Amino acid sequence: MAASFVFLQKILCYILRYRKNVVLLQKNEYMKNLRIIVLSVWCIAYGTLCTAATPFPKTAADSVILDAIQKDSIIPGAVLCVVENGEISYLQAYGNRAVVPAQEAMTTNTIFDLASVSKPTGAGSAALLLCAEGKLNVNDYVAQYIPQYHSDVQIRHLMTHYSGLPAYMTATRLDSIYLARGVEMARAEFTIDTIARCKRPSAVGEKYRYSCLNFISLQKVVEAIVGEDINTYMRYKLYRPLGNSTMGWLPADSLYDRIAPTECIDDICILGDVHDPLARIMMTGVSGNAGVFATAEEVANWAIWFMNLPEETRINGCNAGLWTDSVSTSTGSFTQSCRHTGYTGTSVTILPEEKRAVILLTNRVHPKDEHNLAPLRRALNNMLTP
């Protein structure tokens, strides 16, 4: 379901971005999707007719989160941050941020490994900034920036997961490739070179396949343009101006006492290092697919920034790593929704037109990776659009 809406949003993005030059769309693709486009435009148009939204049910949210901690033991703890009318209206911590090796109470300033929520908040936002400055175009070919890359892949294919690339490459597989090439130590340049030359399961534009490799590729495009690593660029271009002093990759040692640990392997808990093996081992912690650390309030600040972008830029942004959907509101009409989840137990859902967002950060994989967070996420999302 999410994949189909991403595709719809991609088409809408083209129409809005190039409305004076619709011929850029291939005629066959346009005619094939005409009915879908009309329906999507109708949904978005009706979203603007929504009346004032019902206040977020904070007490009910507290209840479902506490049940997940105390009754169902799905998570050790969580931080919930709610944005209403473009401002943070609620920030609450629950349970514990650590239970192994010792119990530590959760605090609202706890720093989380965002996992795949790094895609929209990191590489996706970086690409969005560069597009707004005219330094990058969604129709640019990736090979313009990474010469050895597949020649038919455009930036838009990376953003919308239509590149045809595999979903993932395990650290074990990459390690074997490195050894075969005589490379003894994992280095990011060898990882991107392997991605650039890998066999693709499907042709470009043929099939939606969510892929971490797309956003590692996007990261390297960004770095080629700005001339520095994405961590440095985003810290000073976006995170610090938003007041997000701790947001970014590779958190400082001085912040470790505020970081929520993730999975414990052989009695050693991952703390301060990204949980994702591809990002941690093969990209040495700075990766487009994962690795951003932040507090719930910092993610909310990012969401507010995103909601205040011009509509056309925002729609491009929904394609820059965010799932897109049209959800029903309390009035029975529709509004655009952007959302993304992270493997460690993180999620962000944004309703840009209503200036509302819900950020739920948990360390679901602590101390063991064995619980499903989908019911809790679904319950909170339903509260966002009662």
Predicted regions and their residues:
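Residue-level preference for non-acidic, small/hydrophobic
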Residues: I65-L66, L80, G86, A123, ...
